[in-house]
Amino acid sequence: MKNILRLTLNGRAREDLVPDNMLLLDYLRETVGLTGTKQGCDGGECGACTVLVDDRPRLACSTLAHQVAGKKVETVESLATQGTLSKLQAAFHEKLGTQCGFCTPGMIMASEALLRKNPSPSRDEIKAALAGNLCRCTGYVRSSKSVETAAAARLCEEGAR
């Protein structure tokens, strides 16, 4: 059975006819065409599919699309503006926190959720925020440094205002 799904996706209101059993991951990738959210384990284990739902990290591979009805959903595509990387994305690039890139969107979205909640996280808080995201390439040191760099850049920007 299909029903209408209404949500705000990356700042825009959407309304789509979606099967009741469709996963949020499939909705984003197949229906909407947003492929930044990666399909990794399909079991809620790797974090590659992390998106933000009302500013909180959520695994799109284990969330039905209809569970986000009426909510604000953000994917990694929402972070760059007019082709310019966000401070967080730029920090991941600068600090080589991307390597193969497969886990990067999920890492970035988990980090974005952390920085929105806590603009100046400790290393332990960063480690805890990234704990649900598996990375076989970087060993997490570069990812953690990326988050620290982005946090400092954001705080510096806020102080300049």
UniProtKB/Swiss-Prot annotation:
EC supergroup of this enzyme: oxidoreductase
Record-listed [2Fe-2S] cluster 2 binding positions: C100, C103, C135, C137
Reported regulation of activity: Inactivated by low concentrations of cyanide in vitro.
Cofactor details (free text): Binds 2 [2Fe-2S] clusters per subunit.
Its EC number(s): 1.1.7.1
Keywords per UniProt: 2Fe-2S, Iron, Iron-sulfur, Metal-binding, Oxidoreductase
One Pfam family matching this protein: Fer2
Top-level taxon of the source organism: Bacteria
Cofactors that this protein relies on: [2Fe-2S] cluster
InterPro entries: 2Fe-2S-bd, 2Fe-2S-bd_dom_sf, 2Fe-2S_ferredoxin-like_sf, 2Fe-2S_ferredoxin-type, 2Fe2S_fd_BS, 4hydrxbenzoyl-CoA_Rdtase_gsu, Beta-grasp_dom_sf, Diverse_Oxidoreductases
Residue ranges constituting the 2Fe-2S ferredoxin-type domain according to the UniProt record: 3-79
Binding positions ([2Fe-2S] cluster 1): C41, C46, C49, C61
SUPFAM superfamilies: 2Fe-2S ferredoxin-like, CO dehydrogenase ISP C-domain like
One Gene Ontology MF term: metal ion binding
Catalysed reactions listed for this entry: oxidized 2[4Fe-4S]-[ferredoxin] + benzoyl-CoA + H2O = 4-hydroxybenzoyl-CoA + reduced 2[4Fe-4S]-[ferredoxin] + 2 H(+)
Self-association state and partner proteins as the record states: Heterohexamer of two alpha, two beta and two gamma subunits.
Biological role: Component of a complex that catalyzes the reductive dehydroxylation of 4-hydroxybenzoyl-CoA to benzoyl-CoA. Reaction is not reversible. Is a key enzyme in the anaerobic degradation of phenolic compounds.
Name used for this protein in its record: 4-hydroxybenzoyl-CoA reductase subunit gamma
Gene: hcrC
